[in-house]
Amino acid sequence: PNEIDRYSQRMDHLHSAIFERAEVKYLKVPDGYFAQMSKFLPHHYTLRGYWLQGELIGFVSYHFDHSIMKCQYFGLDRQVRDTLPIYQYLLIDAIAAGLERTGIRTIEYGRTASEMKSAVGAEPHSLYALVKHRNPIKNQLVDVFVQWLHPVQFERRHVFKS
């Protein structure tokens, strides 16, 4: 955790850079989130960093929940991302982390960058969520709004022989 504390601000910055440019913004994590999670869940939460010439240029966080490994948040240096395939390394390292941990049967990448994730063998699965507003009138509008939501279509790659 000492090294994580030392790079906490840099991780916050790298994650914010990705978050601010995202088309869909789900939840902005508070500053210090990654360091706090590593302390709060030491056996169920992992951070992996990516370094170039001694500088942290990216990271990914994993949360382990029984037999499922969830890739939660990541951060990348935008300039380095444009010159190196760091996002692909991040996806492949997630597979390695899942294989290294005993009992993991499923790796969940999330629903963004689906085409890139399919390049490493990821397959989309339906997600279900309960969406409810506290105000009953607004809750009826939520139903109408949710009907319009559909996953982004993408060209799925088949990296494994059928």
Q: How would you label these PLM feature ranges?
A:
Residues 1-82:
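A conserved beta-strand-loop-helix scaffold within acyl/acetyltransferase catalytic domains
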Residues 5-6, 88-89, 145:
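Short, flexible segments with low predicted structural confidence
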Residues 16, 20-23, 39-42, 55, ...:
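Hydrophobic alpha-helix feature that most strongly marks membrane-spanning transmembrane helices
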Residues 20-30, 94, 156-162:
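Short, charge-rich amphipathic segments
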Residues 52, 105-162:
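Active-site/acyl-donor-binding loops of N-acyltransferases
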Residues 67-132:
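Acyl-donor binding region in acyl/amide transferases
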